[in-house]
């Protein structure tokens, strides 16, 4: 079982390195992310649930961790996450079923009641 909190921390550290090595590219990426995530017709929670569904459908584990955490931070419930995963499975078929289990595991580890494993 993947430890999602530690995994996303590792990716954040690598992204900081990448930001130092390719500042122009990462600045442009950050601008794109900020523009896409700014609430307009959809609120931040809905956007993160969409991003989570896409993460599952395209099989991006690293994306799953970040978007599960962000969805929770914006108040997503387990039921909302499950519904988003259902849409990802519908759009991505069998492989999305497997990656939906990754997202569910990440949800269980990131939710506030989850105990943090000892390092």
Question: What annotation goes with each model-predicted range?
Answer:
Residues 60-63:
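Short cysteine clusters
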Residues 1-46, 99-119:
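Acidic, glycine/proline-rich low-complexity segments that act as flexible tails and inter-domain linkers
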Residues 82-108:
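C-terminal structural segments of small proteins and small subunits
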Residues 66-78, 104-107:
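Iron-sulfur (Fe-S) cluster-binding segments and ferredoxin-like electron-carrier domains
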Residues 41-58, 79-85:
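Immediate flanking context of iron-sulfur cluster ligation sites
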